[in-house]
């Protein structure tokens, strides 16, 4: 018998021509998005809102940022998860640029890293962040429509912040596969990742199998906050990064987070779907992730509920 073909994530075309609300193509993509987020919690996305030139430019800016002296990068340290400088020596380092759709905030971050200014960095990451936030907005709109929750959409989006995160992984120095980022779930609403042509991201299915998406497309994944909002109808997937020898990697990830409280709408609670999570604040969830209990639980929202009664 032949070998079983490797599992593949759904590939969804998010080209702007398909993203006009009310059209047949919109409705088709909306169905695909809902089904993928229910079954896998993630999918590969063909996105033309960001040109190859802009994607390459923002990747270069990520390297430029992470090439700064350690003492400079530490000026943006001691921040919540994703927003700030993090480093695991000889493995990876990352930096988040918060409030990426607010030009004034991006300028402030840029001036912190480069007191003499760096207009090109500021303009590039702001442009990229805005375009990715637009895609994120469209995806959330599709999800809300699919649940018949349009009346809650505007207030939900008004309570959303966007963040751009660069993560650079050192080239493994040994043969075979090498773990580069441990198993975890994102705490975001949505995350949109670009691997910049180097594979590494892996997702665990509900059945315990592993899927390795291609490095050709963006990858959209659902975070615990959106899972909680949906009352468990959407799936927040476990994932990790594993690299092979002779491959360095830099990823760019666009996150959307609630500004404060995440709460399940009453319309999504019924006898068949009892309330899974009480309202909780994102800052408290992120703080839990850094406790001993949170680290042991791969920062899982269900363990957070048991720990806090949320």
Swiss-Prot record:
InterPro entries: DIOX_N (IPR026992), IPNS-like_FE2OG_OXY (IPR044861), IPNS-like_sf (IPR027443), Iron_ascorbate_oxido_reductase (IPR050231), Oxoglu/Fe-dep_dioxygenase_dom (IPR005123). It is an enzyme of class 1 (oxidoreductase). Keywords: Dioxygenase, Iron, Metal-binding, Oxidoreductase. Disulfide bonds: none annotated. Combinatorially expression of Sinopodophyllum hexandrum (mayapple) genes of the podophyllotoxin pathway (e.g. DIR, PLR, SDH, CYP719A23, OMT3, CYP71CU1, OMT1, 2-ODD, CYP71BE54 and CYP82D61) in Nicotiana benthamiana (tobacco) results in the production of the chemotherapeutic compound etoposide. Fe cation binds at residues 184, 186, 239. 2-oxoglutarate binds at residue 249. Pathway: Aromatic compound metabolism; phenylpropanoid biosynthesis. One of its GO terms (biological process) is phenylpropanoid biosynthetic process. The keyword DNA-binding does not apply. It comes from the Eukaryota. It catalyses: (-)-yatein + 2-oxoglutarate + O2 = (-)-deoxypodophyllotoxin + succinate + CO2 + H2O. Binds 1 Fe(2+) ion per subunit. Induction: Transiently induced after wounding. Residues 159-258 form the Fe2OG dioxygenase domain. Mostly expressed in leaves and stems. SUPFAM superfamilies: Clavaminate synthase-like. Its EC number is 1.14.20.8. 2-oxoglutarate-dependent dioxygenase involved in the biosynthesis of etoposide, a chemotherapeutic compound of the topoisomerase inhibitor family. Catalyzes the conversion of yatein to deoxypodophyllotoxin. Can also use, to some extent, demethylyatein as substrate. Belongs to the iron/ascorbate-dependent oxidoreductase family. This is Deoxypodophyllotoxin synthase.
């Amino acid at each position: 018998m032949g070998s079983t073909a490797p599992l593949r994530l759904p590939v969804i075309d998010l080209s702007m021509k398909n993203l006009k609300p009310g059209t047949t193509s919109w409705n088709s993509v909306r169905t695909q998005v809902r089904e993928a987020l229910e079954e896998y919690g993630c999918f590969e996305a063909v996105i033309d809102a960001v040109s190859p030139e802009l994607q390459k430019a923002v990747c270069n800016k990520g390297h430029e940022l992470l090439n700064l002296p350690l003492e400079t990068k530490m000026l943006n340290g001691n921040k919540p998860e994703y927003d700030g400088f993090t480093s695991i020596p000889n493995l990876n380092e990352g930096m988040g640029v918060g409030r990426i759709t607010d030009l004034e905030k991006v300028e402030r971050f840029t001036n912190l890293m480069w007191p003499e200014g760096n207009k090109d960095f500021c303009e590039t990451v702001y442009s990229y962040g805005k375009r990715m936030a637009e895609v994120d907005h469209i995806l959330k709109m599709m999800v809300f429509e699919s649940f018949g929750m349009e009346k809650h959409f505007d207030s939900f989006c008004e309570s959303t912040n966007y963040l751009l995160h660069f993560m650079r992984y050192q080239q493994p120095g040994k043969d075979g596969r090498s773990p580069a980022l441990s198993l975890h779930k994102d705490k975001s609403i949505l995350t949109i990742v670009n691997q910049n042509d180097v594979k590494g991201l892996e997702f665990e299915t509900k059945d315990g199998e592993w899927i390795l998406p291609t490095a050709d497309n963006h990858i959209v994944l659902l975070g615990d906050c959106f899972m909680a909002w949906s009352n468990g109808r959407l799936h927040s997937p476990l994932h990790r990064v594993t690299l092979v020898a002779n491959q360095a990697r830099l990823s760019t990830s666009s996150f959307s987070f609630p500004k404060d409280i995440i709460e399940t709408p009453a319309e999504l609670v019924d006898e068949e779907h009892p309330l899974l999570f009480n309202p909780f604040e994102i800052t408290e969830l992120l703080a839990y992730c850094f406790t001993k209990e949170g680290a042991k639980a791969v920062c899982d929202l269900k363990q957070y509920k048991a720990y806090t009664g949320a």
